[in-house]
């Protein structure tokens, strides 16, 4: 028996679609509507536990418990540890912070690889490192297919100077799906880490980040019916080695070093 999608039920989950002037919204690459359940969860957090979650009183404890529950749930979805997870405001900002956190670990004259298949979020922040004596190498798509050929990556890595390769899991420009595991192996064999933009991928597939062996992976929750938040995954050893971008007292404090200002409580708690 073929299952039939209950369109009316699906529409009823999204209050914005109930507006008389609601437009058809066919721009899933830009984001998604938010269902009532998310709206209710955010509202409940603000009315029940909107306070600093580290305090010892009851409302703070409830808020902290909700945030930690959400972090554990997200970590389980991607097969990672909660202490390898940063929840920040957007992938663009997470990538920007990461670029500043990784630069001190590179030497002048080191190289990084970027692509012309990526969203600006995972391109511009790395290209700007050229202003700090980092060589930026371009891994370009095949102009006839739009694909990135891993064979074209190998010569870019041949001299051993490349410290980082930034590329998308799925390109929101041409729609190509990249073999993340294979590209990661090539980069690792050359001594480079990888930073993968998964924003256009996670709405269609749920990657096992441990199995992919990526060093860093980024995704935005508002592409998948969530609030305007984004996750940055990093292997614990990689996170522990970054330069702190947060308050001085977070130096050495794991993922907090990549989250200046902290997480938006009501959104993360939803």
PLM segments and residue spans:
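Pyridoxal 5′-phosphate
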Residues: 1-270
């Amino acid at each position: 028996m073929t299952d039939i999608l209950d369109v009316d039920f699906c529409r009823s989950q999204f209050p914005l679609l109930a507006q008389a002037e609601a437009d058809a919204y066919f721009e899933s690459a830009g984001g998604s509507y938010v269902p009532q359940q998310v709206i209710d969860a955010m509202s409940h957090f603000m009315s029940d536990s909107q306070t600093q979650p580290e305090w010892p009183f009851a409302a703070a404890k409830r808020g902290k418990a909700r945030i930690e529950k959400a972090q554990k749930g997200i970590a389980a979805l991607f097969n990672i540890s909660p202490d390898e997870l940063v929840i920040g405001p957007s992938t663009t900002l997470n990538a920007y912070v990461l670029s500043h956190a990784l630069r001190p670990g590179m030497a002048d004259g080191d190289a990084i690889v970027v692509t012309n298949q990526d969203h600006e979020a995972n391109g511009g922040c790395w290209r700007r490192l050229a202003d700090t004596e980092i060589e930026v190498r371009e891994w370009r798509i095949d102009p006839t297919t739009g694909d990135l050929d891993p064979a074209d990556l190998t010569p870019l890595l041949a001299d051993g100077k490349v410290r980082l390769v930034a590329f998308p899991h799925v390109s929101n420009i041409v729609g190509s799906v990249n073999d993340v595991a294979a590209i990661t192996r090539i980069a690792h064999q050359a001594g480079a880490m990888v930073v993968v933009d998964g924003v256009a991928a996670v709405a269609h597939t749920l990657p096992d980040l441990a199995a992919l062996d990526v060093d860093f992976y980024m995704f935005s929750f508002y592409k998948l019916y969530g609030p305007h938040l984004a996750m940055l995954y990093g292997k614990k050893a990689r996170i522990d080695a970054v330069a702190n971008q947060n308050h001085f007292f977070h130096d050495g404090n794991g993922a907090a070093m990549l989250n200046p200002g902290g997480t938006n409580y009501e959104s993360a708690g939803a």
